[in-house]
UniProtKB/Swiss-Prot annotation:
Pfam families, alphabetized: DUF1328 (PF07043)
Protein name: UPF0391 membrane protein rrnAC2507
Subcellular location: Cell membrane
UniProt entry keywords in alphabetical sequence: Cell membrane, Membrane, Transmembrane, Transmembrane helix
Membrane topology value: Multi-pass membrane protein
Family: Belongs to the UPF0391 family.
Tagged with keyword Transferase: no
GO terms for cellular component: plasma membrane
Presence of the UniProt keyword Glycosyltransferase in the record: no
Organism: Haloarcula marismortui (strain ATCC 43049 / DSM 3752 / JCM 8966 / VKM B-1809) (Halobacterium marismortui)
Length: 47
């Protein structure tokens, strides 16, 4: 979860600075990590 938060912050900073490619990539990776975290958390709670 830590890396997802770091990548979201990086995406916001890069977006403000005008680096659209880096911001988009960082946001996609962060979103993927958050989805993985939520799936694993759900599986853990169900077991």
């Amino acid at each position: 979860m830590y890396y997802a938060v770091v990548l979201v912050i990086l995406a916001v900073v890069a977006g403000i600075a005008g680096f659209r490619g880096i911001a988009g990539l960082s946001f996609r990776v962060a979103k993927f990590l958050i989805v993985i975290f939520l799936v694993l958390a759900l599986v853990t709670f169900l077991l």
